[in-house]
Each structure stands twice: as C-alpha cells, then as structure tokens.
C-alpha cells in the first residue's frame, strides 16, 4: 500500500502517517520540511500551493488530506498523478450552531458563529472535492484528542493536575463535550477502505458526550490526582480560562457505529494522551489560561 498524507508533521496528519508506518505501509508525507519528520515516512518536500509536477510520477492507493480550504483541495487534485481513494478530514465546524442537534450528515451547512472562517473554509474544501471526485470520502470529527495533540486542551488539565491546582470550572461544569480519539479515526479510515460504503460523508466521534466536570475528573485521575473545583458563574469569556468555547454540540454518529461499533474509552484515550504529553510538553501550543486564572479569577 502506498499512502499519501498531506502534512504529516503535526497532530492528526502526523498520527495518521505513523499509524500506517506501523502497519508496514509505504507512507509519503507532503510538507515543506520545516519540522522534524516521523520515522519511517518518505518525505515529498513541497508547498501544497506550489506543487508543479512534484506528485505526477507517484501512484497512491489512498490520499488522506487534512486540507483547510477549497483552494488547498483544488491545487492538490490538479497536481496528483494516479490515485484510487481520497479521504478528506473535515470538521464538525461545517454545521451552523442553530441547526437541529444531533447534527446529521445531510444537514444544511453554513457559517458557525463560534468557528467562523475555519468552518466555511472546510465547507469549501468539501464542496470542491465532491465536485471533482464524487467518490471521495469526507469525515467530520468533533474534538479530536490523543497522543500528539498540540492544541492546549487535555494538556491544560494535565498541567493543572500536575501542579495540584484547583480547577476553575465554567458554571457547574454540566456542558457536554464530544470527543474522538485519533486512533479511532485511523481505524475508521481502514474500515471505509475495506467496506467501501456508498455513503460518502460520515460524522465520526464517540456516541456518548461527557460533561466538562467529568472530563476534568478523568484528566486528573490519569495524572493520579483528584480534582477539586471552583465554579465560575460570572459572565466571563469561557476561553479565557478554559480550553473550549461555551458551545455544546453533538454529532449523530450512528452511521459510523454501523460500520465500527466500538471506540476507545475516554479513560484509556486520556491515559495515552498523558503518556505522550509528559515526554512532549514542548510540542503543545500553550495558551495563558493559568496566568489568566491567577491574575483575574483568584
């Protein structure tokens, strides 16, 4: 198998690349070579916006793309040689916040007031792809987590736990979050390529949401600590002191579960995330959440 992964240096694309290296596949990563490359991959050093004939000679069985925009997709499709399958990792940000929940794959797509341009760019990427290749697969995950996550989400809670800090909770911590482990994302890609379902667009994620309070408790437990909470009921922008917007949403993932009926438990997934984090703290994009708490909320 020859897999091409666009990017391959950060979180999702890096994890996917290493997952297929572990399976013994030929994995080609397409990036500008500004970061350390994973072991076992073959680098195609290029800017995806200026590919020329770089890719023409290759024949890939599958292209896995984390494109952000329609332009990204258009330029890659123009530059590719022969390939069989194309999988785009899109996002739940394509659904407007006012759509009926849980969001179904056929729901109307539009700007989401929390995600803004990120979401509309992903809509463009999907639109361009399906116009050019109606047989491509599109995956719409919720919050992805696990090893290599460079976004300051679970890592923030781990930091609080490691420092024996009280956790500053938005209100009572009842808001639900929906997650999907990056390893389950890879497993589902395998299922798609094996089963080749006629459905082309899939929401992916854990069926069960988790309250913020419970999620924080799990993160602390993984570190070997017990969480104690300070509830924040003031009208403060939640992202100043917490990792997520004050926006609860849920994807309908029943189509995914028909094809792949099991997912990693949050406990196990967070254990894996923590095991990676303690050796890779420098790879996470920290935000000054703890500083804000200490300066403003304490």
Model-flagged regions — what are they?
Residues 2-23:
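N-terminal Rossmann NAD(P)H-binding glycine-rich loop of SDR-like oxidoreductase domains
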Residues 6, 146, 170-175, 202-210, ...:
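Glycine-rich Rossmann NAD(P)(H)-binding loop
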Residues 91-117, 131:
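Active-site "gating" loop of Rossmann-like NAD(P)-dependent oxidoreductase/epimerase domains
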Residues 126-148:
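Conserved beta-loop-beta element that borders a ligand/cofactor-binding pocket
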Residues 158-168, 175-210, 217:
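Alpha-helical substrate-binding/gating segment
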Residues 191-248, 281, 290, 294-298:
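Mid/C-terminal beta-alpha module of Rossmann-like enzyme folds, strongest
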Residues 237-262, 268, 279-282:
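Conserved C-terminal active-site "lid" loop/helix of NAD(P)H-dependent oxidoreductases
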Residues 266-298:
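Amphipathic terminal alpha-helices
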